[in-house]
């Protein structure tokens, strides 16, 4: 297998979808086999490769083609102000990318905002949806037990509005259960991504002012989703409440949940080995 790194797997596609006309999407494309599309979260500086770099190798070695798009308005993809809820627009961007690449059907892995995109994709394009793997997905409305928005979401919006290294540290301290793993390399890498395109930050805020988070809620339609689904959650998630996982398995047609202890909002990173074993087994046998 050729060397697996960000630069060697990097490419761009141009899509034409509603709200995304002549729009460039950056992605990383690695491996061969059944397609798995990994959708990243919505924090400032997020991107496909950085969100999943602890998972790409094991998936490729297991015989999957892994595609990691940067969502519209993130990392190397074009910037955008959205007039519709972000999960739906992101789902359209995935469909557009698949069209350009000639991919008819794919499994979807989605973390946080990426989970919201995966849910919307399954609702809009069920015939093109394989299995779903969701980690603390957004887009599920209020919580029965937790005041919303949660602490992490408040810090996320603070970082978008007033980007600083100190606010980034505060957000990462909430983002991860074990704060000792927040290395200077992780911090500086994320900070560099944030600074690379200030328009992304400004346009995220403008989009949120036009379409609030409450508009993302697809709870009423969960029963329509037929795709086999693995839901994972960090017991200590301070961005999206744990009871949303119960909402998913109570309403979706074929879903089960796995909760990681000593884990916050980034299960695929904090518990990478266990996550990789669990999800690869689900794709092969679930």
Swiss-Prot record:
State the EC number(s): 3.7.1.8
- Annotated site, Transition state stabilizer, chain positions: 112
Keywords for this protein: Aromatic hydrocarbons catabolism, Hydrolase
Binding sites annotated in the UniProt record for substrate: 42-43, 51, 111, 180, 190, 266
> For this UniProt entry, which residues form the secretion signal?
none
Q: Name one GO biological process term.
A: biphenyl catabolic process
Q: Which residues form the active site?
A: 265 (proton acceptor)
Q: Which family does it belong to?
A: Belongs to the AB hydrolase superfamily. BphD family.
HAMAP family xref list: Biphenyl_BphD
Q: What is this protein called?
A: 2-hydroxy-6-oxo-6-phenylhexa-2,4-dienoate hydrolase
Q: What gene is this protein a product of?
A: bphD
């Amino acid at each position: 297998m050729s060397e697996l790194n960000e630069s060697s797997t990097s490419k761009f596609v141009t899509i034409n979808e509603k709200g995304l006309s002549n729009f460039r999407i950056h992605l990383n494309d690695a491996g061969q086999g059944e397609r798995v599309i990994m959708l990243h979260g919505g924090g400032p500086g997020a991107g496909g490769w950085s969100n999943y770099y602890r998972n790409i190798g094991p998936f490729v070695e297991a015989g999957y083609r892994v595609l990691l798009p940067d969502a519209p308005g993130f990392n190397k993809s074009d910037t955008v102000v959205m007039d519709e809820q972000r999960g739906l627009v992101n789902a359209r961007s995935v469909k557009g990318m698949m069209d350009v690449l000639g991919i008819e059907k794919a499994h979807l892995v989605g973390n946080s905002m990426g989970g919201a995109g995966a849910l919307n994709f399954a609702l809009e394009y069920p015939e093109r949806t394989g299995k779903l793997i969701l980690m603390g997905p957004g887009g599920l409305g209020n919580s029965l037990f937790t005041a919303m928005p949660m602490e992490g979401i408040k810090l996320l919006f603070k970082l978008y509005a007033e980007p600083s290294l100190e606010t980034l540290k505060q957000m990462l301290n909430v983002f991860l259960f074990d704060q000792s793993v927040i290395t200077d390399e992780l911090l500086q890498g994320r900070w560099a991504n944030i600074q690379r395109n200030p328009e992304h930050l400004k346009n995220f805020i403008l989009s949120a002012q036009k379409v609030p988070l409450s508009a993302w809620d697809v709870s009423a339609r969960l029963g329509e989703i037929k795709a086999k689904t693995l839901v994972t959650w960090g017991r200590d998630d301070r961005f999206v409440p744990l009871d949303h996982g119960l909402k998913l398995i109570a309403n979706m047609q074929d879903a089960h949940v796995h909760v990681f202890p000593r884990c916050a909002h980034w299960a695929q990173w904090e518990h990478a080995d266990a996550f990789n074993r669990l999800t690869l087994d689900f794709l092969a046998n679930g």
